Amino acid sequence: MSRIAETFARLRAAGRIALMPYLTVGFPERTSTLELVPALEAAGASLFELGIPFSDPLADGTTIQRATQRALENGITIADCIATVAELRARRVAAPLLLMGYYNPLLRYGLERACAALAAAGGDGWIIPDLPLEEADDLRQLAAAHQLDLIMFIAPTTPPARISQITAQASGFLYIVSLTGVTGARQTLAGNLTDLIANVRQQTNLPLVVGFGISQPAHIAEVARIADGAIVGSALIDRLERLPPEDRVSGAAAYIRELLSAVARP
């Protein structure tokens, strides 16, 4: 059983859902991720989505775009992101670690090279928001050969026939996009989220993890009623931007604990 599968099985047995923070590798400072991930894991985070900086992050709103630009200014590359995963494992981080990035930089780096390196570093998979299902076979097969998962997306606008195609090829968990548009904290989630998740549930036993717009305990409570996990990204990056350097780690951990107060399943 993979580390991702073990994590969701353990949480399910405990009656809880997963909280998965998103962090841009190398933001705010080059080594910040190495300090933040262990602290957030200790605060109760279950998995981590670690963003590879890219100059044209199409799926991301202004908050993560700023974080990405800062990380690029700090000189962060794909190789640095993979090395960060290895260092986090050396620091005894046990949670699943997935790299999120865009396809062109990964293609330039080399799919086989990237999968082999991420597996050797102790990573668990890829999240590639601009990779359509029709073009995913190469990376999906290489990832599987290295015991990595390629996480696939389902959005409110995904047609039923395409949901069936995605669930047939998915592994690890499914990333359920809670609303249309780019990433960013919102006050409310999509009204049809419950129906979307019910439809997907009929077609897969994989865990369903909701992302985009998650920012407050009420959102976590809403997701806990219908899904297996929630991803918090832009709201966490916002906090890191606002906090003074000496308070970033403790403040981020406090935010995770605040969100987790709503994570127990009813």
UniProtKB/Swiss-Prot annotation:
Keyword Lyase among UniProt keywords: yes
E.C. designation(s): 4.2.1.20
GO annotations of cellular component type: cytosol
One Pfam entry name: Trp_syntA
Top-rank taxon: Bacteria
Single GO biological process annotation from the record: L-tryptophan biosynthetic process
Keyword Amino-acid biosynthesis: yes
Functional note: The alpha subunit is responsible for the aldol cleavage of indoleglycerol phosphate to indole and glyceraldehyde 3-phosphate.
The protein, known as: Tryptophan synthase alpha chain
Gene name linked to the record: trpA
